[in-house]
């Protein structure tokens, strides 16, 4: 392999540096210079890192896995042969104080701390015994020898665009890392036991005459034959010494499935294809020559039927296969090495973890080994500095490199978010912040008993106990009342016979989103009468009469600065009767049942607290006749609460149970569609719950709302619903298994395009559970 060795020697020669014994921990950091855009320099080598997100490889179907594998192979093939690449998986331990500050509910001494303690205990129970304290990140670091920073930047700009494009084909989000983000990786590794400190400020450090190394380096580093010690923690660098003939694609994820701080890196040195082909052709020629010489010797001994020795035949077969890979199957030749560093709090724990890792490698018929007397070089190789100091390289093709695929399962971990369950594959916590999404509206879909209401109530509990946001609930099944009352909220029961009333004409100076509240209210009254006489049946003359009467009814109230008694529909009825037009009497007669008749609940003065931050509108007993009008008044009340809160800078969360009911009536369907599109602008979020997915999807409006929602919780589904959702949301057969005949609280979460299988359980021996459950005998 004269030619190939020459190429490798050239790379080794350029990487070779004079060894200097480090006299301080700062000198042990092999970076010489950094730039704010994230370019690092070590010798004549410049490096740039890209962070990329995980994808759902583990739960993908065989066909999807093949497609992902081929897309990842394309990414590897796109790597420039003039540079080297390092793919790094970083298991980073989450700081306990940071976790508690971001997720646990602080006590407020408002009479609800008992529930906060129960909720916090539930959260802490989900952390213990799982990998929840470990957060995994992925980086791709590209290194290249250039004369100066300008040439390096030009190169990285071109290569970076290519890398991010190929990652997007894999549905992985790639992003460039700046200097602070790259340095944070090393600080988290070297100073993992320290709490999060101030962010790195390059200008401030330069003014003080300090080096960036002071921010990342530990207090001490001690290296021995087969391990090292950083501060009070122990570490060891391993490398892949021998590979199996066939490696399964889950080996990398299994090697990283250890609840410890660790990093695994795969260094890749691509070889120019033309050079690789020439070398393999020369090697094949050498093999054929050896076979010919062997046969000639056998013929000279009159052994004309001798079979070519197995080792020669195998060598010829493998060389031909390699040449075929390079020339007809678009494979590239590359050198690679896999290194891994893991950390522990004690030497005993370190040795135990090392044995666990070696055992995983043996399971895959591979052999990992400890780097003896090379722990410094090994550490500098495995960390994403962009350099390689270990030269135990293995010749690989694109396929054999791609099988070391760095993907496993998507995670959802958004700081400051709400807990929604655990990843069914990795058991990691799923924490999402709907406020950070482009469209934070949500649907929860599932058959009866699948856990829809429980999931919504859990979210309501978190919001009620951790924020000052307003929570408004449309409750057609009377399922939320007990919880709302326990959280010091207000339950407004609306029916023809209830003792609680909502005045349909309630209005204050903040009503609507207009400078003139009267205009908004006049439009509402027109909509109200359209519900009474039938949509489209109001004539222009009747609309004019209603507008005139509305102004008359509110005149004194507005003059008093909205301080006098609020008018009711009865006042409007009397005003209509005073009008000279015959149409006015017709309008009064059409509305008499709902104003002076037996269904006059919305013609009374409001006698409940509509200012409470948590309100459940119980419309179970509304009845078919009163439902359209009841929906209109209730939704008007909800929307105006959203507008008023927006003007105060306050967030509003709306939960609508049995969402499909809203689409039986054109007004409520149109209202929620408009609300869905506009509410983000008003700092509001809508959540729809339903078990009748098929009926909901009969509405094109509902289908559009569902398809455009960035946050969905899909629980156990009926067969017909499952098929509809699979088409609408592009769910694969494997993913559908997570919403097929599964228990309560299990399913799929879709967040920002990520589709993650989850499971969610809550301790039954708690007051919160009894408030949230709807199971008979447990309430």
Locate each region found by the language model:
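Post-Walker A helix-loop "phosphate-sensing" segment adjacent to the P-loop in P-loop NTPases
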Residues: 462-472
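Hydrophobic positions on the alpha1 helix immediately C-terminal to the Walker A/P-loop
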Residues: 455
């Amino acid at each position: 392999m004269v030619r190939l060795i020459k190429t490798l020697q050239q790379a080794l020669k350029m990487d070779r540096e004079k060894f200097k014994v480090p006299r301080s921990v700062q000198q042990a950091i092999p970076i010489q210079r950094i730039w704010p855009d994230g370019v690092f320099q070590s010798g004549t080598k410049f490096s740039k890192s890209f962070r990329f997100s995980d994808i759902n490889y583990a739960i993908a179907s065989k066909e999807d896995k093949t497609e992902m594998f081929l897309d990842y192979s394309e990414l590897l093939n796109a790597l420039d042969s003039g540079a080297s690449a390092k793919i790094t998986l970083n298991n980073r331990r989450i700081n306990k104080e940071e976790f508690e500050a971001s997720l646990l509910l602080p006590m407020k001494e408002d009479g609800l701390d008992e529930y906060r303690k129960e909720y916090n205990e539930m959260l802490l129970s989900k952390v213990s015994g799982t990998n929840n304290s470990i957060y995994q990140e992925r980086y791709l670091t590209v290194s290249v020898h250039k004369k100066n920073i300008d040439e390096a930047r030009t190169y990285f700009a071109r290569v970076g665009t290519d890398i991010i494009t190929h990652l997007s084909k894999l549905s992985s989000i790639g992003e460039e890392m700046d200097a602070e983000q790259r340095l944070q990786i090393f600080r988290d590794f070297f100073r993992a036991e320290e709490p999060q400190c101030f962010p790195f400020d390059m200008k401030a450090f330069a003014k003080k005459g300090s080096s960036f190394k002071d921010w990342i380096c530990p207090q001490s580093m001690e290296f021995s034959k087969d391990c090292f010690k950083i501060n009070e923690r122990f570490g060891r660098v391993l490398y892949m010494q021998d590979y199996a003939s066939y490696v399964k694609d889950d080996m990398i994820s299994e090697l990283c499935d250890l609840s410890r701080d660790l990093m695994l890196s795969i260094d890749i040195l691509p070889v120019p294809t033309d050079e690789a082909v020439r070398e393999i052709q020369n090697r094949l020629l050498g093999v054929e020559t050896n076979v010919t010489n062997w046969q000639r010797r056998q013929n000279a001994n009159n052994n004309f039927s001798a079979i070519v020795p197995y080792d020669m035949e195998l060598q010829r077969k493998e060389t031909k296969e390699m040449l075929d890979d390079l020339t007809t199957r678009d494979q590239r030749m590359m050198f690679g090495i896999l290194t891994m560093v893991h950390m522990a709090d004690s030497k005993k724990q370190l040795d135990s973890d090392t044995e666990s890792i070696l055992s995983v490698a043996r399971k895959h018929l591979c052999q990992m080994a400890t780097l003896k007397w090379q722990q410094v070089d090994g550490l500098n190789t495995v960390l994403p500095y962009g350099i390689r100091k270990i030269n135990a390289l293995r010749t690989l093709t694109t396929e054999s490199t791609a099988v070391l695929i760095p993907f496993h399962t998507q995670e959802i971990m958004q700081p400051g978010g709400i807990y929604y369950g655990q990843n069914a594959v990795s058991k990691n916590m799923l924490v999402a912040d709907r406020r950070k999404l482009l469209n934070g509206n949500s649907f929860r879909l599932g058959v009866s008993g699948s856990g829809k209401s429980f999931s919504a109530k859990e979210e309501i509990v978190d919001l009620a106990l951790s924020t000052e946001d307003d929570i408004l609930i449309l409750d057609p099944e009377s399922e939320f009342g007990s919880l709302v009352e326990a959280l010091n909220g207000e339950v407004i029961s609306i029916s023809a016979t209830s003792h609680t009333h909502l005045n349909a004409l309630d209005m204050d100076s903040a009503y609507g989103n207009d400078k003139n509240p009267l205009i908004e209210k006049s439009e509402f009254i027109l909509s109200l009468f359209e519900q009474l006489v039938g949509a489209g049946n109001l004539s222009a003359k009747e609309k004019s009469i209603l507008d005139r009467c509305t102004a008359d009814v509110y005149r004194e109230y507005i003059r008093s600065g909205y301080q006098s008694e609020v008018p009711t529909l009865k006042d409007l009825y009397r005003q209509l009767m005073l009008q000279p037009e015959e149409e006015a009497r017709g309008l009064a007669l059409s509305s008499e049942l709902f104003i002076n008749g037996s269904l006059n609940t919305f013609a009374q003065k409001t006698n409940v607290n509509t200012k409470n931050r948590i309100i459940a509108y119980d419309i179970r007993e509304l009845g078919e006749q009163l439902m359209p009008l009841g929906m209109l008044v209730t939704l008007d009340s909800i929307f105006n609460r959203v507008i008023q809160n927006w003007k105060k800078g306050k967030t509003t969360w709306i939960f609508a149970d049995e969402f499909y009911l809203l689409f039986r009536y054109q007004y409520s369907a149109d209202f929620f569609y408009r609300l869905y599109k506009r509410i983000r602008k008003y700092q509001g979020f809508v959540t729809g719950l339903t078990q009748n997915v098929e009926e909901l999807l009969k509405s094109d409006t509902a289908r559009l709302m569902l398809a455009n929602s960035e946050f969905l919780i899909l629980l156990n589904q009926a067969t017909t619903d499952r098929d509809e959702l699979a088409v609408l949301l592009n769910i694969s057969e494997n993913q559908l298994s997570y919403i097929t005949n599964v228990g309560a609280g299990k399913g799929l979460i879709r967040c920002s395009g990520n589709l993650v299988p989850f499971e969610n359980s809550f301790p039954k021996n708690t007051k919160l559970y009894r408030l949230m459950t709807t199971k008979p005998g447990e309430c």
